[in-house]
Amino acid sequence: MSGRHALVIGYGRSGRAAAAFIKRQGGTVRVVDRADTPELRAELERAGIAARLGGYGAQDLNGTDLVVVSPGVPWDEPLVETARQRGMEVTSEIDLFFRACPARIAGITGTNGKTTTTALTAEVLRAGGLQVMRGGNIGEPVLDRIEQLHAEDWVVLELSSFQLESIERPRLRIGVVLNVTPDHLDRHKSFERYVELKTRAVAFMESDDHAVLNVDDPTCAAMRSETRGRVIEFGLHHPVGNGVTTSDGWIMMADAGQPRRVMRTADVPLPGEHNLSNVMAAIGAGYAAGVDAERMAEAARRFKAVEHRLEPVGTFHGARWYNDSKATNPDSTYKALAAFREPIILIAGGRNKGIDLEPLARTIARRVTGLVTMGETGEELARRVRDAGLDRVERAADLGDAVRKAAALAPPGSVVLLSPAFTSYDMFSDYEDRGRRFKATVRAELGQ
């Protein structure tokens, strides 16, 4: 990077890490961002970085030979396209990490379950005595910590479709694909393109790498033909030749047709069949890294729910409340609904990413006893769910109103579930902001 002149587009968490890395490597950095706040200006001034805020255009490419694109900036953004047309190198924070990382990388992708499986995989590898750094689409950027890594270490990354799109050659020593259902169609334009990006997690492997694939998901299963890596399958509902399955209440690891017990399914500490599948994926990754079965089981048994993913909030007036704010698409909400046998009062709604609401409305009407909607999709979702046959539907003006209305609908013994099925950007800064405000509002309104 020494002597390079970089333009960083977007100064969020990823952009900050890229700018700092390039400066550490001896390059110069300028930043452009559509946002313009006193806090952002002060932060850039403290970092000693020149910037243009409030918008950007082709003139910002002058004097630049490297363009770094943040995950929130579309890969077909006009400024990025112009940079390519001018022959400039275009990269991303996560691509810079892949190029410079001395350690082995395990990547977890899929439409849902990435964060939980990434966190659990990191714990499974640590249980095997390995040095592990966790990051990617969660936590602090790994590029900020790259100097801490050595060749014998592992990095476990959560990789979104946005990140996979921005990495030139995402070679993973272990690549896990959990599931692929329609998501981010507003950005990727088609499901086919979305699948293509997810496939990149296994497409650049060598013969000694491992692709951990969900055979219950036909799109994932089809990726077997797209990788040179050794395939480790996992599945609850389809036969598994070499990989992780269940039998007679046990999670089993089948190696060359020889099944071995790993742990009892009843000992999985997270609710829902989808979380059982996530645990099986992490065990597959641990097997690929050479971790002993008993150590994998110990790590899985002591694992705690990740924040905003079916996270227990508390019991109030006899109803159990859960924060599943990370459910930003319908498939994630379907899995959350399937995790409970009790009557469910669902809080849902937000900003749509180009998803058809009709299948979601039918599932909600069939599965829940009451619905409270909010956000941009709230009115349409409420109407469609009523049309699908559910009468107990309320429309909330804001989060506090949603909590109060859900509490009024919830009898003792029921579950109140925030699982929005849509993104948070209409009302909140991100899903974490939505989840934390939800927990605080529940405790403030209901008395704890």
Residue ranges and their predicted role:
Residues M1-S92, L96, P271:
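N-terminal leader/targeting and accessory segments in enzymes
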Residues S2-H5, G15-Q25, M263-T369, R383-R386:
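Nucleotide phosphate-binding/pyrophosphate-handling subdomain across enzymes
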Residues R13, A35-P38, H238, G375-E379:
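Helix N-cap at the beta1-alpha1 junction of Rossmann-like dinucleotide-binding domains, i.e.
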Residues I22, V67, I108, N137, ...:
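Residue-level signal for inorganic ion chemistry
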Residues K23-R24, Q59-N62, P71-V215, T219-R230, ...:
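Phosphate-binding loop of NTP-binding sites
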Residues G27-R34, A211-V215, I345-A348, R367-E376:
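Short internal beta-strands
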Residues D33-A35, L53-G55, T91-L96, G229-T246, ...:
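Beta-strand->loop->alpha-helix junctions that form or flank phosphate-binding loops
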Residues L40-I49, E358-S414, Q448:
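C-terminal helical cap/extension that packs against the catalytic core
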